[in-house]
Amino acid sequence: MKKYVGLLLLLTMFSVGYAQENVVKHWEYDINGKNGIACRYVQARNLLFMSGFSVADNDVFYFAGGKPLSVVCFKGTKKVYQRVIDELPTKLSMFKVVKDSVYLVNDQNLTLYRMHKSGQGPVDKVKLNIGKLRPCEGAMQESGFVLIQRIGQPLHANYKATYFNDSGRLIKEEDIENKDNVMCNSSECKKILDSYLYPSAKLVFPDFDGNYKGTWNGYNIFWGLFGNSGKASWTLAFADKDGKVAKRYDINYHLNDMYDVIPLPVLTNDIDPETFTTAPTYCMLHGENLYILGYSGAKKKIILCRINLLNAFNSEQSAK
């Protein structure tokens, strides 16, 4: 009987581990260095800043970061190239790969950079026509990109959204009126600005805090944190067009192991010496997979995590 119970426990542990391995995969990279990813890392405070990342087919990954600002390409964990494109690091993350081109906007000198994704050829530079104000937010979009400027006093400001195409030509400007006079550093203000920066979809999911990542197989995909008095998890939600969750995949955690499976997200927005945030672009949907960029100070590694949507959808259990 004891042997039977022991065997059953072993098989259960194996099936859970296999199920997680079938859903979640990791790649690890050095922080900076000849074979690593260029970034800005403050080891004493365990702060790691990236200027962006993107994914192409066949496990080809593109990263931007560091000082000087570089674009780095990997095939899996094999480095393909690293190319310096600017001496000045970014304070925001605005980076994408579309068709055969890599695009990066440096918010510090208001310049759009474009180069071939092979790393070969010239780097085109376009100075943006946005005036003297520095953008406080920005994001790449499916076509073009948007920068947001703060106008007025920091605590109760209005904003202006400026839209550009992928050639760096100004398309339109839109005033964002702070009708409710919300504070600039509040969650309400963030929601207002995010509505101009990132696509969204309806979701009815109490106790969930996350972001819309795109569509897959007829479902709207959301990624974020779920938490109530009985449970805490990283959660992948599959929702229908009405926002109802049809399926969810949970990676349960306790406070001491929150980043065991899903790594600590990289920082993207360097607002001031004491304020750092992570834009939703640290996590992106590509094809059949969700990719999440993070790091481990203990391991001294940048970690790219991939969640296979089909296997997560078909899974009958959580990852932990």
Model-identified regions with their sequence ranges:
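Repeated scaffold domains used in trafficking and secretory/extracellular systems
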Residues: 36-53, 89-99, 130-142, 177-188, ...
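Coil residues (strongly favoring Ser/Thr
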Residues: 19, 60, 87, 100-101, ...
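Blade-level signature of beta-propeller repeat domains, shared across WD40, Kelch, NHL, RCC1
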Residues: 281-320
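Surface-exposed loop/turn elements that mediate protein-protein interactions on large endomembrane-trafficking
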Residues: 21-38, 66-84, 110-129, 158-206, ...
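Short beta-strand elements that form the blades of beta-propeller/WD-repeat-like
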Residues: 47-65, 96-106, 142-154, 187-199, ...
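Bacterial Sec-dependent signal peptides at the C-terminal "C-region" and cleavage site
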Residues: 15-21
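Sec-dependent N-terminal signal peptides
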Residues: 4-14
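Post-signal peptide N-terminal segment of secreted/secretory-pathway proteins
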Residues: 55-101
